[in-house]
């Protein structure tokens, strides 16, 4: 039998047939071979806990380049100076399912960017849909569990998700996106990313603006129907990762145009919805037609150019958090954002250990090119009006978790706008996708779903009911 060579953690080579030599027949190899124990113990411990959410992912390196002057609205070094380039790493992901799940499943997709700026690391933690399911962070664990397999059988159970939706109507806007073909984006390159939350950009004089940034894919959207996505998943569970890496190897570097929406704090209370409510999007002019348009202002371009050489060390050990901000950026009062400021670093301490920021993937590169001049102290933030203070207090009121009319208005206007924005087939696909899911739940739950959808639009509820009952029969 040919001799094989194993390498212990010390780096020393160890020869022996099947790597299990015996020096004394009276003693076990475990007693004889400390290197074997080393090899086995390393194998037993080589995997780290997977992420609680966004477990399945892929990543690549690139750079962000400033293409437009935005010095009038920000004092962020990375964004000051047309032509300035900042290295970054991007991780794409699915959200609720496990690390080994197919990338084509109906799921919200994540796009997290770590910018290695001269002021430290600045993380953008984005989704491919510009809103979220809930605005009350205490509901987050139940929301995630409702989308996971049934703990009794470990089999998917749509009743759990529809029960959550019917009891939490603020989810309806996001649910409409999830069950449209937005929920089955085919590849990461064609996916846009949205911060979803409001942040604050603070100027040296203490003045500030609410902002929401997003990345629009220059490759354009690439949707698949539910049937196509299911077939892709069966044929290639890693389809999106493979597409990303193959494009980089061909020299086809995907890019995204980065834009920001800006709201003055004195104007925020005048808007017909609360921009601190992450279940709503900042209207770019698509819908609702009677809500103020908040235009996007171009900042720059993000381009991916290089795939990782060691996925575990370079991508799996990445630790992103919306709390990783730089000079000139602050978190808003959005309760979901405030909860994430704690939850992300806490999860990373569990997954990667307390010193996870010292790992090469997460280490800052600031001052790498020499000492950097100290930034001038910023003036205290200017205090907005009492009207603004009263508006902010809404997020702390008991009514924040309760349904309100905008929870139905936004999904209703999305439903009505779909034929104009994407075509009749896109709207019909939403009905088909919902019906396939609802047809798997008991009759009493189906009736509850129809009643909930009727709060959005009667024709939506009627069409889902008709198709669902046809499937059931």
From Swiss-Prot:
Family assignment from sequence similarity: Belongs to the catalase family.
Keywords recorded for this protein, A-Z: Alkaloid metabolism, Heme, Hydrogen peroxide, Iron, Metal-binding, Oxidoreductase, Peroxidase
Top-rank EC class of the record's enzyme: oxidoreductase
Record keyword Heme present: yes
GO biological process assignments: hydrogen peroxide catabolic process; indole alkaloid biosynthetic process; response to hydrogen peroxide
UniProt-recorded Gene Ontology molecular function terms: catalase activity; heme binding; metal ion binding
EC number: 1.11.-.-
Lineage of the organism: Eukaryota, Fungi, Dikarya, Ascomycota, Pezizomycotina
Keyword Heme: yes
Positions of heme binding: 344
Pfam families hit by this protein: Catalase
Highest taxon listed in the record's lineage: Eukaryota
Catalytic residues as annotated in Swiss-Prot or TrEMBL: 54
Function according to Swiss-Prot or TrEMBL: Catalase; part of the gene cluster that mediates the biosynthesis of fungal ergot alkaloid. DmaW catalyzes the first step of ergot alkaloid biosynthesis by condensing dimethylallyl diphosphate (DMAP) and tryptophan to form 4-dimethylallyl-L-tryptophan. The second step is catalyzed by the methyltransferase easF that methylates 4-dimethylallyl-L-tryptophan in the presence of S-adenosyl-L-methionine, resulting in the formation of 4-dimethylallyl-L-abrine.
Region (Disordered): 1-31, 369-388
Pathway: Alkaloid biosynthesis; ergot alkaloid biosynthesis
InterPro entries: Catalase, Catalase_AS, Catalase_clade1/3, Catalase_core, Catalase_haem_BS, Catalase_sf
Low complexity: bias regions: 1-15
Entry cofactors: heme
Record's protein name: Catalase easC
């Amino acid at each position: 039998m040919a001799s094989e060579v194993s390498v212990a953690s010390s780096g020393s080579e160890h020869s022996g047939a099947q790597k299990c030599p015996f020096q004394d027949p009276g003693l076990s190899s475990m007693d004889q071979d400390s290197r074997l124990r080393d090899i086995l113990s390393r194998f037993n411990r080589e995997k780290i806990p997977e992420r609680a959410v966004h477990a399945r992912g892929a990543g690549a390196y690139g750079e962000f380049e400033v293409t437009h002057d935005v010095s009038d609205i920000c004092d962020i070094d990375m964004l000051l100076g047309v032509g300035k380039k900042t290295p970054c790493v991007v991780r794409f992901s699915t959200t609720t399912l496990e690390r080994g799940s197919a990338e084509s499943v109906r799921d919200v997709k994540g796009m997290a960017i770590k910018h290695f700026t001269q002021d430290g690391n600045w993380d953008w933690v984005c989704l491919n849909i510009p809103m979220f399911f809930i605005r009350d962070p205490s509901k987050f664990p139940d929301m995630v569990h409702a989308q996971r397999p049934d703990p009794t059988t470990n089999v998917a159970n749509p009743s759990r998700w529809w029960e959550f939706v019917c009891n939490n109507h603020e989810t309806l806007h996001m649910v409409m996106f999830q069950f449209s073909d937005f929920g089955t984006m085919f590849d990461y390159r064609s996916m846009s990313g949205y911060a979803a939350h409001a942040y604050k950009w603070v100027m040296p004089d203490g003045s500030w603006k609410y902002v929401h940034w997003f990345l629009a894919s220059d490759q354009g959207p690439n949707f698949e129907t539910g049937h196509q996505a299911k077939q892709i998943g069966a044929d290639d569970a890693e389809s999106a990762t493979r597409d990303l890496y193959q494009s980089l190897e061909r020299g086809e570097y995907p890019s995204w145009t980065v834009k920001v929406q800006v709201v003055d704090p004195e104007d925020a209370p005048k808007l017909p919805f609360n921009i601190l409510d992450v279940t709503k999007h900042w209207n770019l002019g698509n819908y609702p037609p009677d809500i103020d348009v908040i235009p996007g202002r171009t900042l720059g371009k993000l381009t991916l150019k290089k795939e990782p050489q060691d996925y575990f060390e370079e991508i799996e050990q990445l630790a992103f958090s919306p709390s990783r901000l730089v000079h000139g950026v602050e978190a808003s009062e959005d309760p979901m954002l405030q909860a994430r400021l704690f939850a992300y670093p806490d999860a990373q301490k569990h997954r990667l250990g307390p010193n996870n920021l010292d790992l090469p993937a997460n280490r800052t590169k600031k001052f790498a090119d020499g000492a950097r001049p100290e930034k001038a102290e910023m003036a205290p933030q200017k205090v907005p009006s009492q009207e603004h203070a009263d508006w902010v207090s809404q997020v702390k009121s008991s009514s924040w978790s309760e349904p309100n009319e905008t929870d139905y208005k936004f999904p209703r206007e999305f439903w009505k706008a779909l034929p104009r924005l994407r075509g009749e087939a896109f709207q019909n696909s939403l009905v088909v996708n919902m019906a396939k899911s609802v047809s798997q739940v008991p009759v009493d739950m189906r009736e509850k779903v129809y009643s909930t959808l009727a709060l959005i639009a009667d024709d939506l509820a009627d069409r889902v009911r008709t198709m669902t009952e046809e499937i059931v029969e």
